[in-house]
């Protein structure tokens, strides 16, 4: 049975997210000799070579012995990167972590391969606490799904989706999600300073509170709504703060913000599809 530890895995693109996945695979015991990374940037190749990873600037060379090919390039260079590989990936599992790149778009560019998995990761994967929304074409069987989960699991949570359209919702919730929490942290730190705390104190308290609240929500049998109610005493300080949130319609604005993110994700996917068709 195929497992991530007995596969040759090629990464087309060696940026931060690719390096996060590589780090996760190495931590699970995948030998460096089974990983090849193709990237045009010499500095990126040098960083990976220092870890014992085989690198090249030649995508054709990189995929030669690969069982799995992970596409990790910027959306704007997708067509340029994939067109020379057309017809050469039909015997390989292709995993894309490229934002906005629909399975049909990738399939049209590479030709032949229908074993395509689309992943929407997020940046906490860099510290092994990511959240990955995953969708696969019908040609991707159980073994390929398990293999994909193994490759991604070392960097965080993996959730398989029922249809590809849900990727846009995943993008809005978890793909862009870290920025929402950073925004809240910024605001709380700024408020703490305005209330008389030193910046380093306000920062430490805010970050630890965010970590603790997330850990409570993950480990508790109660929902986040129930946890919020449990710490909100009648006429207390928490209620005073939450009433300000309610008057400002924070909940409604968050829903509107995520809807805007989903819409933009849909637009970007369409723009990328149109661009690749015109190449």
Predicted regions and their residues:
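NAD(P)+-binding Rossmann beta1-loop-alpha1 motif at the extreme N-terminus of oxidoreductases
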Residues: 1-57, 61, 193-194
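Short pre-catalytic strand/loop immediately N-terminal to key active-site residues, enriched for Gly-Thr
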Residues: 117, 166-172, 224-229
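Rossmann-like NAD(P)(H) cofactor-binding subdomain of soluble oxidoreductases
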Residues: 42, 51, 59-64, 68-134, ...
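Small-residue helix-packing motif on alpha-helices
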Residues: 35, 62, 198-205, 227, ...
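NAD(P)-dependent Rossmann-like dehydrogenase/reductase catalytic/cofactor-binding core
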Residues: 2, 207-279
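Internal alpha-helical scaffold of NAD(P)-dependent oxidoreductase catalytic cores
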Residues: 105-115, 131-169, 182-219
């Amino acid at each position: 049975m195929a497992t991530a530890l007995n596969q040759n895995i090629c990464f087309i693109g060696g940026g931060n997210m690719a390096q996060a996945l590589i780090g996760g695979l190495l931590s699970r015991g995948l030998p460096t000799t089974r990983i090849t990374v193709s990237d045009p940037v010499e500095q990126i190749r040098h960083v990976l070579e220092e870890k014992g990873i085989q690198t090249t600037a030649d995508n054709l060379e990189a995929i030669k012995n690969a069982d799995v090919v992970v596409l990790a390039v910027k959306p704007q260079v997708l067509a340029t990167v994939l067109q020379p590989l057309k017809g050469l990936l039909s015997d390989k599992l292709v995993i894309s972590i490229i934002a906005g790149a629909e399975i049909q778009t990738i399939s049209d560019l590479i030709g032949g391969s229908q074993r395509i998995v689309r992943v929407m990761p997020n940046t906490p994967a860099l510290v092994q606490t990511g959240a990955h929304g995953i969708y696969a074409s019908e040609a991707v069987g159980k073994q390929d799904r398990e293999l994909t989960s193994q490759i991604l699991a070392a960097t965080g949570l993996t959730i398989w989706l029922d249809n590809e359209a849900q990727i846009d919702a995943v993008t809005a919730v978890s793909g862009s999600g870290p920025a929402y929490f950073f925004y809240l942290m910024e605001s709380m730190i700024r408020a703490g300073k305005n209330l008389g705390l030193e910046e380093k104190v306000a920062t430490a308290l805010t970050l630890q509170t965010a970590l603790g609240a997330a850990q409570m929500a993950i480990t508790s049998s109660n929902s986040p709504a129930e946890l919020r109610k449990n710490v909100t005493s009648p006429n207390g300080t928490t209620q005073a703060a939450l009433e300000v949130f309610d008057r400002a319609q924070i909940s409604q604005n968050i829903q509107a913000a995520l809807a805007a993110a989903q819409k933009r994700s849909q637009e970007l996917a369409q723009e990328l599809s149109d661009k690749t068709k015109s190449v």
